[in-house]
């Protein structure tokens, strides 16, 4: 049994340390909301937008994120695992110390996102432009970063993947 919330605007709401299971969020705009440390288990976010929200420490497990935007969102320490992400946009969003693991991704975009110390495993970034993001201390495998677009400075953050040392 799924709970569905459809075509709504949710403003200035705080729902922290909570659990959402098998929920569908369709055509929802979240503005200035705080969902810190909330678990979203087997949920779907379809055509949703998060604006100036706080999702610190959230767990997105076995979720579907389709046509969803995160604009100026604090997602530090967030876990996104075993999820499908299609047409997802992260703009000016902080994902410091976040974890992306075992995800299927298609057409995701990062614009000026802070990916400092993010851990990405079994989530391919092939074809994704990271050149305008901060990736200091990123933990990622060579297979997952292969095919991503990075700038010259970022290349130094990823040189360890080649097993070489710069002196």
Question: Which stretches of residues belong to each language-model region?
Answer:
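Tandem repeat scaffolds
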Residues: 1-167
